[in-house]
């Protein structure tokens, strides 16, 4: 069954839906004008035959571009990036990304940015809203099957293992070696944002770790060696090296001796492992899936408040889990935040400001289904401070609003970006919180 991804843009005009019973998208017609994208039209492939879809929108003065996707050469549409005007609800720009090419954008890079994508999936259909212009665009996705490689090393000794290839990526690799053989492997896979762990072998020796910054980084290559090794009296893996889409490589883990091998497929990521295991890891193979486009990096929004104190920046994370706000006599005295990293570790960042005898009030999110979309607040000059101080904070999520922490004052502000969630904080602080800003990333 196809996955229907919500349309991005304005939900105004006539709702349309081309459906999801196609095999591929083969041609896209887009007409742009001064006010945005006027219309869009698709050609699909179904049971080997071309199906021409209707026009969505209207034709005015402008320019039309055609994007051809060569499905006969196994090219398929992975994702779409674009911008829409939050006031008018009109799509302003579209860019199409396939497994073989990133096409030039059509339109103007203005407004709220959006992405239509799904992990390890291709687009087979579209839906949205339109009237005189294309107001919103959504898509249907189906999973792209992974491809299993042959096993390198021993192919008959030990027992077979197979983690499968239905994961979105790999977050962390653990390899244990005793100096002559690879004894144990463990893989932390990502599946729909959750970690699933698989491990094989005997954990005897020294364990080495290699962390991948998923979803911004993927393992793309595994190199290694294997040899007939004593005292095991059989062929076993003697070393492993992992390389990523960012050009990083782990050190060679183990003893580089014997026959060399390399598991790599152009344009693909490694999303799973299989092989043979006995007292050691005797052989290893992988599952390949198309390397997805990297999500846009987090964006840092300018802080609001006064200019006093020292600058601080927690950075950007996968999500915010918990917020602590400490109040003082004249304003917010301190804040600290609990985050989840992309490797599923929970960290409590440093305190910003000075803790008072009043302690902290807490706001805990229903993670992972709940996330922060905006921060509202107030700032003002107060007695004892030459520059502005944050006097009130309130956090808005996709489900609810927090109570206000502190008191409203002269100057109010809001930190948010349409279509984005808050994944980190920065600001300025002394014995009080003078300024606060946020890091945001597009909501998947």
UniProtKB/Swiss-Prot annotation:
The keyword Lipid biosynthesis does not apply. Residues 2-143, 146-290, 298-442 form the Jacalin-type lectin domain. The modification N-acetylalanine is found at residue 2. Gene3D superfamilies: Jacalin-like lectin domain. It comes from the Eukaryota. CDD domains: Jacalin. Keywords: Acetylation, Lectin, Repeat. InterPro entries: Jacalin-like_lectin_dom (IPR001229), Jacalin-like_lectin_dom_plant (IPR033734), Jacalin-like_lectin_dom_sf (IPR036404). One of its GO terms (molecular function) is carbohydrate binding. It holds the Pfam family Jacalin. SMART domains: Jacalin. Belongs to the jacalin lectin family. PANTHER family: JACALIN-RELATED LECTIN 11-RELATED (PTHR47293:SF66), JACALIN-RELATED LECTIN 3 (PTHR47293). This is Jacalin-related lectin 11. It comes from Arabidopsis thaliana. The gene is JAL11.
């Amino acid at each position: 069954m196809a996955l229907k991804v919500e349309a991005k843009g304005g939900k105004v005009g006539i709702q349309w839906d081309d459906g999801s019973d196609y095999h591929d998208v083969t041609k896209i017609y887009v007409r742009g004008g001064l006010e945005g994208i006027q219309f869009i039209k698709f050609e699909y492939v179904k049971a080997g035959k071309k199906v021409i879809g209707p026009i969505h929108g209207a034709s005015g003065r402008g320019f039309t571009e055609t994007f051809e996707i060569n499905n006969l050469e196994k090219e398929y549409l992975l994702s779409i990036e674009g911008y829409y005007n939050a006031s008018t609800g009109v799509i302003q720009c579209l860019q199409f990304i396939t497994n073989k090419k990133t096409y030039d954008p059509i339109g103007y890079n203005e407004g709220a940015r959006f992405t239509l994508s799904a992990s390890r999936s291709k687009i087979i259909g579209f839906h949205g809203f339109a009237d005189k212009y294309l107001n919103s665009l959504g898509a249907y996705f189906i999973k792209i099957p992974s491809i299993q490689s042959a096993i390198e090393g021993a192919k008959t000794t030990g027992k077979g293992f197979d983690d499968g290839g239905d994961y979105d990526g790999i977050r962390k690799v653990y390899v244990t070696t005793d100096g002559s053989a690879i004894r144990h492997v463990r893989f932390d896979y990502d599946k729909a944002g959750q970690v699933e762990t698989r491990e094989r072998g005997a954990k005897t020796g020294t364990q080495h770790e290699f962390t991948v910054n998923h979803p911004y980084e993927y393992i793309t290559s595994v190199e290694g060696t294997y040899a007939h090794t004593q005292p095991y009296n059989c062929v076993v893996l003697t070393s492993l090296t992992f390389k990523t889409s960012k050009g990083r490589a782990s050190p060679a883990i183990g003893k580089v001796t014997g026959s060399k091998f390399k598991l790599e497929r152009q344009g693909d990521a490694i999303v799973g492992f299989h092989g043979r295991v006995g007292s050691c890891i005797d052989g290893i193979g992988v599952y390949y899936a198309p390397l997805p486009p990297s999500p846009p990096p987090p964006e840092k929004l300018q802080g609001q408040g006064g200019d006093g104190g020292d600058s601080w920046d927690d950075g950007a994370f996968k999500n915010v889990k918990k917020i602590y706000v400490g109040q003082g006599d004249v304003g917010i005295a301190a804040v600290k935040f609990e985050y989840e990293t992309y490797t599923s570790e929970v960290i409590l960042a440093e305190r910003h400001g000075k803790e008072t005898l009043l302690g902290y009030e807490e706001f805990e999110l229903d993670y992972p289904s709940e996330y922060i979309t905006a921060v509202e607040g107030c700032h003002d000059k107060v007695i004892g401070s030459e520059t502005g101080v944050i006097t009130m904070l309130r956090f808005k999520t996709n489900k609810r609003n927090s109570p206000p922490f502190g008191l409203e004052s002269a100057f109010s502000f809001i930190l948010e970006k349409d279509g984005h969630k808050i994944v980190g904080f920065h600001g300025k602080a002394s014995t009080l919180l003078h300024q606060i800003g946020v890091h945001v990333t597009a909501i998947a």
